[in-house]
Amino acid sequence: MRFFNTKKGLLTLGIIAGLGAALLAYLGNPKNMAFCIACFIRDTSGSMKFHNAEVVQYFRPEIVGIILGAFLISLFTKEYRSTGGSSPVIRFFLGVIMMVCALVFLGCPLRMILRMSAGDISSYVGFVGFAAGVATGSFFLRKGFSLGRAYPVKKENGYVLPIVVAVLFALVIAVPSLYVFSKKGPGSMHAVWYAALGVGLVFGVIAQKSRMCFAGSLRDIILLKDFRLFSVIGGIFIVMLIYNIATENFKFVAFGPIAHAQTIWNILSMYAVGFCAVLLGGCPLRQLVLAGTGSSDSVITVLGMFVGAAFAHNFKLAAGAAAVENAAKGIKAAAGGPGINGQIFVIISIIALFIVAFYGVKREKNK
């Protein structure tokens, strides 16, 4: 098991995770969206009728798989720890911010890497903002930022989320009429449920054992000069790059499928996501994994992300995808990007993150 704590071991786990993502892409998940925590939570909230955007409504088994995979492996390896009490209200609203800003970019950090592997230039632009956000968060960590200590709680607290998502998914299979499903758009594109669930389970196991975190990998490089976590991300990128080249999906373009090329908003939205992820202690994927391994604080964050996903579409905060005119298919050119509501939300979010960061540093110094 020590092997998987080395750079080579983590790279191997990343390659396995990348193969899972490639399989989902091959089996029908949307282009450049084989795996996206933000998009899949958004789709799931839509399927449960929390928003009415008809093209993004599907109960994604991958989300269930990640939570259950992390939960089961943590029990098996005795790494399960039920904790809570670290600024839950602040974490909830940070979860909302992280989700809405990800949907302004049209993807979480995981999807950003998948888009980069397909040659989507707008994702590289987003990466610049994400890295800057992580650097800003790391600066405040150096200054002593903390949301407060988490305390041990009854272990049954950590069982609630895995049980709830398992029951909700069982109802999808047994009584699908309880949910709504997209008939067109990204929500209508998906791998068969048992493959999606299986890959999600494996992904959850790998993410828990490797501590996979897109913000954490950059944070460790900045603060510790430690590149080990980045090896996992590199493995995913390499596999998806090979897959995209092999399937002729790799193209250097201003924006790929379900993306936009509004540079300033790609940068600012991912800046907020990176900053927020460091303050929370993990990116959207990491929050799912921690929620599955007993962290009530991460459960609160995930609930915030779920609410944020519905909020983004109900209040027109999410960005629209850009489109190139195609008269033969009846497609009109569209610039895409966020409307004024989304733009205002991103700016307010960045201001709020600085307030939280300054407060977290000040509180620790006054102890």
What function would you assign to each model-found segment?
Residues 1-367:
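Membrane-interfacial helix-loop segments of redox and metal-homeostasis proteins
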